[in-house]
Amino acid sequence: MKRIIISEFMDEPAVEWLKEQGFDATYDPGLVDRPDDLAAALEADARALIVRNRTQVRGPLLDAGGKLEVVGRLGVGLDNIDLETCKTRGITVLPATGGNTVSVAEYVITAMLVLRRGAWFGTSEVTAGLWPRQKMIGQEVMGTTLGLIGFGEIAQAVAARAQAFGIRVLAHDPFLPGDAAAWRGAERRETLDEMLAVSDFVSLHTPLTPETRNLIDPGRLAAMKEGAILINTARGGVLDEAAVAEALRSGRLGGAALDVFAEEPLPAGSPLDGAPNLLATPHVAGVTEQSNVRISWLIARGVAGHLS
């Protein structure tokens, strides 16, 4: 039987299905925190490895997996996988493209509504007997402008939902041809800075590459519309966290929703600790009960098909 190692959480019916197809599937979501055990498991003739974003598929781990044929990624970001080495060694990498689109898009819209309205943060005061009605008056999203950095599948899903709220949608994506049909869903902007200057919300939807690392830096934050809300569900390294924290404290940013960070979990003493108007979540924008099922079955079937 061909052996499959699953090092992070996966929908268990999909794991059982792999076993029913005749595969020796080892499911241990704690392996991600025991790299030596994971390497040992791969050395035992593993043909497939299924991961999320925490398992670093590179260096010693790839060396241990000498018989690996395929890596299944329970998600879409691939920056935790050494794609060049996988390509050189003939290891196929399968992302769960489309599996978490709805989840991420709904997270972005939710963050926009929560941060724009603001009243949702009044619970502790109200239940303590205070009545901060004037303080809790927020703003509507109708008539505002959303700027999307990157206009792939997830950003397009965000655009469609935002337009249903009466939000104007702009997008900047230098890799999407100007005549692409997708542009019917947003107004194209040639330069990032011109979009930032007029956007009430800015949402990041770009992979982490040498070109996008710290894309949102102090200069870009200064170029944004004062009081704008920044949302990052892409990768932590695409923005300067210290600069974002400072912009929140100074009021330059009206709010931020950050689901991804340069280092996860955040280290002690992070500049984001205590920053006002910050909605911080532990890399869960794409993880819902429904998306976990979709992603797990996409990868289970993809890996099984490859090994068969």
Regions flagged by a language model, labelled:
Residues 1-94, 217:
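An N-terminal-biased, well-structured beta-alpha scaffold segment characteristic
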Residues 2, 87, 94-107, 132, ...:
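C-terminal helix-to-coil terminal segments
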Residues 6, 146-148:
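Hydrophobic Val/Ile/Leu positions in short beta-strands of Rossmann-like dinucleotide-binding domains
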Residues 8, 52-53, 75, 199, ...:
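Glycine-rich, N-terminal phosphate-binding loop of Rossmann-like dinucleotide-binding domains
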Residues 28-30, 74-75, 91-102, 173, ...:
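Short beta->alpha connector loops at strand-helix junctions that form conserved
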Residues 42, 57-60, 174-271:
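Rossmann-like adenosine-cofactor binding region
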Residues 47-48, 70, 201, 229, ...:
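Short, Asp-centered acidic motifs that coordinate Mg2+ and/or phosphate
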Residues 89-91, 97-145, 153, 157-160, ...:
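Phosphate-binding beta-alpha-beta segment of Rossmann-like dinucleotide-binding domains, i.e.
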